[in-house]
UniProtKB/Swiss-Prot annotation:
It comes from the Eukaryota. GO terms for cellular component: membrane. It is found in: Membrane. This is Cytochrome P450 71A21. The chain crosses the membrane at residues 1-21. Keywords: Heme, Iron, Membrane, Metal-binding, Monooxygenase, Oxidoreductase, Transmembrane, Transmembrane helix. Heme binds at C432. Its EC number is 1.14.-.-. Its main location: membrane. It is an enzyme of class 1 (oxidoreductase). It comes from Arabidopsis thaliana (Mouse-ear cress). CDD domains: CYP71-like.
Length: 490
């Protein structure tokens, strides 16, 4: 009896597999982009690997700059060229302006009440307007200049105390961005509080986790077995408790500060925008700022220093520019950096090779659309592979894999959403609204880093320190911390 049951089961599996591949073969005749072969149930999930941006780039060389994957039951377009990115983010920007639902972001970001992951619609338009006009305007960016300068001065003092010894560059830059963003968004630093630091680490780690249930709903129990559901619930609750305390402290305060929480509470009290924001909305917006402002800026500065130490001639050129413009001054001001063209080229080149989110936050189509020669149904997800676009030889030339800031000196290409060959912050309606906010910190911090100190790699670990191995996760960092030796020039 048991042997007969096994024969029936095996026959059934073979029959289902044959039907699946016949259906897939027929599907190839439909007017959709090319797809890699997929497996039953999981589709192309097995082809993502530990570094999906690299795996998808390799697949695009075979299946084209616009290819269709099936991640479980979810159809996903993968974009790997500037031309296709332009079609998605400009020509059909409104159609692809929404975000897909995700268990991770629902649990951690107040069920899409934030700016980054809210679905496209009136609510998203209103809160984006609040962020752009009231929190991230040029006036607000300038108003926090003293905060940036104070924290950079403290960082310089830490380096001075470690002069001629190995400096953990990664740790320094991480602390700097965390302290600056905390003061601007929350009104004070939290870097000395172990619980809040561990909470943010847990959040960053979970954002890079894979939820099986999001793509294969009937296998959602795997998220429970693996502990992901429990981690999401605990971290989401802990985040809410932390942010609730922060907001309540501001409510109980004098209201005279100008950090982001106070600005949002003032908007709530005055009802001055024709749109009511509630407590959850305030916490969601603040969480966006903490996550995006801290992790992305830190990653970019860390990669910039890595590339400069890997290419000493570029480091010398940058130091010569900074020291010439700031001759006689101990520090670099934000006015000084306006004239530093090579500094800006270094940062552009870093974003090209090391976009902090190599796969931009996913988009989703809100209606059927014709994209080139293809019919794309409503509800199709889109992954923009910024990492692949930044290394596209057709755009950047045969040395596209090489760090060469000079390529930007006579180029008008920028990362502010008008040039689709460089999209580390996205483009179109969903472009990161905090570009200016992030870039000014990166520029002035990096300029001060190289102005007062000469940097070199430890002789006993040069190979390890110049390694560009990547971490896993949504934001890509160095796999190992960067150490270097600083020697003062004064």
């Amino acid at each position: 009896m048991e042997s007969m049951t096994m024969i029936i089961l095996q026959s059934l599996i073979i029959f289902i597999t044959i039907l699946f591949f016949k259906k897939q073969k027929r599907g190839k005749k439909s007017n959709t982009p090319r797809s890699p072969p997929r497996l039953p149930l999981i589709g192309n999930l097995h082809q993502l690997g530990h570094h999906p941006h690299r795996s998808l780039c390799s697949l695009s060389h075979r299946y084209g700059p616009l290819m269709l994957l099936h991640l479980g039951r979810v159809p996903v377009l993968v974009v790997s060229s500037a031309d296709v990115a332009r079609d998605i983010l400009k020509t059909h920007d409104r159609v692809f302006a929404s975000r897909p639902r995700s268990k991770l972001f629902e649990k951690l970001f107040y069920d899409g009440r934030d700016v980054a992951f809210a679905p496209y619609g009136e609510y998203w338009r209103q809160i984006k307007s609040v962020c752009v006009l009231r929190l991230l305007s040029n006036k607000m960016v300038t108003s926090f200049r003293n905060v940036r300068q104070e924290e950079i001065s403290l960082m310089m003092e830490k380096i001075q105390k470690s002069s001629s010894l190995q400096v953990n560059v990664s740790e320094l830059l991480g602390s700097l961005t965390n302290d600056v963003i905390s003061r601007i968004a929350l009104g004070r630093k939290y870097s000395g509080e172990t619980d809040s630091k561990e909470l943010m680490k847990r959040l960053m780690m979970l954002m890079g986790e894979f939820s099986v249930g999001t793509y294969v709903p009937w296998l959602g129990w795997i998220d429970w077995i693996s502990g992901l559901d429990g981690q999401l619930n605990k971290t989401g609750n802990d985040l809410d408790e932390f942010l609730e305390k922060v907001v309540q402290d501001h409510v109980d305060g004098d209201g005279q500060r100008t950090d982001f929480v106070d600005v949002l509470l003032r908007i709530q009290r005055e009802k001055s925008i024709g749109f009511e924001i509630d407590r959850l909305c305030i916490k969601a917006i603040v969480l966006d700022v903490l996550v995006a402002g801290t992790d992305s800026s830190y990653a970019l500065m860390d990669w910039a220093m890595t590339e400069l130490l890997r290419h000493p001639e570029c480091l010398r050129t940058l130091q010569e520019e900074v020291r010439t413009i700031c001759k006689g001054n101990l520090s670099v001001s934000e006015e000084d950096i306006q004239n530093m063209s090579y500094l800006k080229a270094v940062i552009k080149e870093t974003t090209r090779l090391h976009p902090p989110l190599p796969l931009l936050a996913p988009h989703e189509s809100i209606q059927d659309v014709i994209l080139g020669d293809y019919h794309i149904p409503a509800g199709t997800q889109v992954m923009i592979n910024a990492w692949a676009i930044g290394r596209e030889a057709a755009t950047w030339g045969p040395d596209a894999e090489k760090f060469r800031p000079e390529r930007h000196l006579d180029s008008s290409v920028d990362f502010r959403g008008h040039n689709f060959e460089l999209v580390p912050f996205g483009a179109g309606r969903r472009i990161c609204p905090a570009i200016s906010f992030a870039v000014v910190l990166i520029e002035v911090a990096l300029a001060n880093f190289v102005h007062r100190y000469d940097w070199k790699l430890p002789e006993d670990s040069k190979e390890n320190q110049t390694n560009v191995a990547e971490s896993t996760g949504m934001v890509i960092h160095r796999l190992f911390p960067l150490y270097a030796i600083a020697s003062s020039t004064t």
